[in-house]
């Protein structure tokens, strides 16, 4: 049952963050240390979406490539837009639909600010 749901969740994450591809970001998908990682990269930043066993998280990297010049959790990039208490609770919920929706909405509404943070 667990393995049947995982591809559905993977597709759902891709659908919710598809607006990044429309903005010219390139998607790379891979596993690292037991975590699923969706990496959306552009010339200005790299948005990594971690779908990990402990939950769900979004990290923004700035610079020309690995190692990045700056790497910040989305809560540091958008402190006034994210209620940390709600975000912490949602991150620990193993990425249910509401968590994915929450972060997709935050990123889509604030993409300009994210791209020009540093």
Give the location of each predicted region.
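Intrinsically disordered, low-complexity regulatory regions enriched in serine/threonine/proline
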Residues: 1-19, 27-118
């Amino acid at each position: 049952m667990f393995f049947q749901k995982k591809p559905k969740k993977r597709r759902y994450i891709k659908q919710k963050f598809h607006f990044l591809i429309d903005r010219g970001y390139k998607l790379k998908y891979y596993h690292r240390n037991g975590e699923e990682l969706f990496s959306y990269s552009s010339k200005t930043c790299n948005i990594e979406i971690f779908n990990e066993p402990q939950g769900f998280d979004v990290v923004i990297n700035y610079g020309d490539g690995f190692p990045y010049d700056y790497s910040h959790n989305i809560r540091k990039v958008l402190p006034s837009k994210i209620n940390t208490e709600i975000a912490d609770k949602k991150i620990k919920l193993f990425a249910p639909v509401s968590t994915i929706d929450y972060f997709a909405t935050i990123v889509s509404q604030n993409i300009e600010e994210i791209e020009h943070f540093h």
